[in-house]
A protein has these predicted regions:
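Glycine/charge-rich catalytic "coupling/switch" loops of P-loop NTPases
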Residues: 2-13, 278-325, 349-380
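The feature captures the beta-strand-to-loop junction immediately N-terminal to the Walker
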Residues: 60-62
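Conserved coupling/switch loops of ABC nucleotide-binding domains, chiefly the family-specific signature
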Residues: 81-84, 134, 234, 266
């Protein structure tokens, strides 16, 4: 599928034409109560969201959560059954993709194998009838922007996966769209290439100031690249927020467990500042929001389960190391703390200092401010 989609009026005005602007105080993109069904399956369930001009937003969630369906609805590729989409003050809800203002990059690159890199980048401009000289100039400028000036005469098969994705990105930008849509563009690449390219995409987005939406199931990718993350589950939005907010202050149990690693235990509020988990009493600032005796899920990040080296306030638990996974810069410990299964993450330096190995005892401390609580059905 062609990755250079945009309004014909912009093409006729020239590739450098300014995108339409929304009124002051209005969001650049407003998604209003979108619902999309495939037969009896509801892929999007009354979804609403606003995105500001120049933002980099990631749609994050597991397979089947609706993130790609939402992206495709914004593009007009899978139109919604209900709801509206307003872009730059214009209702695009019923417009075909060719009349919407966006460029899109797919996971599969979608490059034409029989065309050179230069021709691939300029394809959308040629199809809109722009002069050949203007097309080549624009295509070469974009190849320079993505660092591929010396690859213009090559064919896609002669490029690496990372280079092909850069070509697809350049082609998506050729029409100077107001919105860039990225549908899991890095998932087919090797790990090191993926990390490098996501940094390049973020730097390019900042340089151009283009409003960007990227779909991903990779939590680390979303945390590292997004201005805001939209966490989705079962066709609904669970939480919208900055990476730090979503990671440190998840609003639901699903977000807590999906974004990053999490220890999740069943407990009961024991008072204004503590929860009872098994035989342990764990100090928790969040307990003040619940009545005594309330069943809760008790959540603690592995990096917040720290060795007791003195001076750190919190609950101290005597534990035994049951397993150790060395991951280079960090080590992941599986602990048994008086019958409670806990995962802790330590820096390589801390691991070497403590000289830990399976079977050895370790006292850990959990700061009360780092304990998250979520309501729990008593039988759960």
């Amino acid at each position: 599928m062609d990755t250079t989609v945009g309004p014909r009026v912009r093409a006729e005005a020239g590739a450098g034409a300014a995108p339409p602007t929304s009124a002051p105080g209005e969001p650049y993109l407003a998604i209003c109560r979108l619902t999309k069904r495939f037969g009896a399956f509801t892929a999007l369930d009354d979804v609403s969201l606003t995105i500001e001009r120049g933002e980099f937003v990631c749609f994050l969630g597991p397979s089947g959560c609706g993130k790609t369906t939402l992206l495709r609805a914004i593009a007009g590729l899978d139109p919604q059954d209900e709801g509206r989409i307003i872009q730059a003050g214009r209702d695009v809800s019923a417009l075909p993709p060719s009349r919407r203002d966006f460029g899109i990059v797919f996971q599969s690159y979608a490059l034409f194998p029989n065309m050179t890199v230069l021709a691939n980048v300029g394809y959308g401009l040629v199809s809109q009838g722009l002069p050949r000289a203007a097309v080549e100039r624009r295509a070469r400028d974009l190849l320079a922007l993505v660092g591929l000036s010396d690859q213009a005469r090559k064919y896609p098969a002669q490029l690496s996966g990372g280079q092909q994705q850069r070509v697809a990105l350049a082609r998506a930008l050729a029409m100077n769209p107001g919105l860039l849509l990225l549908d899991e563009p890095l998932s087919a690449l090797d790990a090191l290439v993926r990390v490098h390219l996501r940094g390049e995409i973020k730097a390019l987005q900042r340089r151009l100031g283009i409003t960007t939406i990227m779909v991903t199931h990779d939590q680390e990718e979303a945390l590292s690249i997004a201005d805001r993350i939209v966490v989705m589950n079962r066709g609904r939005i669970e939480q919208v927020g900055t990476p730090d907010r979503v990671y440190r202050h998840p609003q639901t149990l699903f977000v807590a467990g999906f974004v990053g690693r999490m220890n999740t235990l069943s407990g009961t509020v024991a008072g204004a500042g503590a929860v009872s988990v098994g035989e342990a009493l764990i100090a928790a600032d969040a307990a003040s929001a619940y009545g005594s005796g309330t069943p809760v899920h008790v959540c603690v990040r592995p990096e917040d389960v720290q060795p007791d080296l003195g001076g750190l306030p919190g609950t101290r638990l005597a534990a035994t190391v049951r397993g150790l996974e060395y991951l280079g810069s960090i080590a992941r410990l599986e602990l048994d703390a008086s019958g409670l299964p806990l995962t802790a993450e330590l820096s390589d330096t801390a691991l070497r200092t403590l000289s830990l190995s399976p079977g050895e005892p370790l006292t850990v401390v959990i700061p009360p401010a780092r304990v998250l609580l979520f309501p729990r059905v008593a039988s759960a």
